[in-house]
């Protein structure tokens, strides 16, 4: 199975190719999915002053997994003084648009798209209390996404 991400290291540069959906740990069905732990393993190998290059072509995915990745990258920037460079190779949509927001440099090609939207969800068989809880969660996620 082909992974949607690929990690390459060369001369103090670690490249992470995010080409597919960002999946929560409980949703991982096969090796093509990636979780927070997959990114943690890559960033744990980086040394002080290294550069992380993120190549993004993703429709998004799990907002909570993405937020965990964003927080981990921010922590690594502070503790290891890494530089983060982001390239939107094709599509950086939905929560995948959060990843370049933590970069020191962002490159978007003329043929690429960065799509930011309000958080979305779906409910089935929900009552008014369930819907109100979901509204509150979506409002919180929107505030988090603005940070």
Regions found by a protein language model. Give the residues of each.
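Terminal-region recognition feature
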Residues: 1-147
